[in-house]
Amino acid sequence: MSKRVVTVPLQGGKVAVNPQFQDALKQIGLDPNAVVQRVQEELKKVGKYPVQKVEVEVVSPSKYEVKIYLPPIGDLLLKLFGKDTGAHDARNEVIGNLSFAQLVEIALLKKDELKSKTLKSAVKQLLSTCKAMGVTVDGRKAEEVLRDVDGGKYDEIINKFEKQWQQ
């Protein structure tokens, strides 16, 4: 059996089960209730972050994978803060604040898209986006936090999550 992809219908960030979706899963040989339950479990891992799309990749009737796609990082931050655009003057205007833990969490969720070899470099990439958009981290400007990351101030926190990054 070749790999098949079924797009999961979403409504308000939750699975919207409809007859077409159920029929598509049944044709492949999957139990729609089991798939919906697994998709909901995966959505819980994403938590409060907005979801762009969810797909079920089916290799065989007994083997399938749930893939959750988040919006690009800039859009994710805007949605998180309820804004339409980033700061017009990012040096002086702040559109929102993240904790360093949230920054690490977003880096882990966006791992496949960031293409960074280490969690530290992924966090630095996110900090650059925060700087350009006017987002502070722990109430401080992103460039200050970036200097601290380079200086090793956050190594303890980053190392705690490095194993998750390597998986």
Curated annotation (Swiss-Prot):
Supply the alphabetized keyword list: Ribonucleoprotein, Ribosomal protein, RNA-binding, rRNA-binding
Q: Which GO terms describe its biological process?
A: translation
MF terms from GO for this chain are: large ribosomal subunit rRNA binding; structural constituent of ribosome
Q: Does the keyword Cytoplasm apply?
A: no
Taxonomy, superkingdom: Archaea
Q: Which GO terms describe its cellular component?
A: large ribosomal subunit
The Swiss-Prot or TrEMBL record describes its family as follows: Belongs to the universal ribosomal protein uL11 family.
What does it do?
Forms part of the ribosomal stalk which helps the ribosome interact with GTP-bound translation factors.
Kindly give the HAMAP family that the UniProt entry links to this protein. Answer: Ribosomal_uL11
Assembly and binders: Part of the ribosomal stalk of the 50S ribosomal subunit. Interacts with L10 and the large rRNA to form the base of the stalk. L10 forms an elongated spine to which L12 dimers bind in a sequential fashion forming a multimeric L10(L12)X complex.
Protein name (Swiss-Prot/TrEMBL): Large ribosomal subunit protein uL11
The record lists the organism as: Pyrobaculum aerophilum (strain ATCC 51768 / DSM 7523 / JCM 9630 / CIP 104966 / NBRC 100827 / IM2)
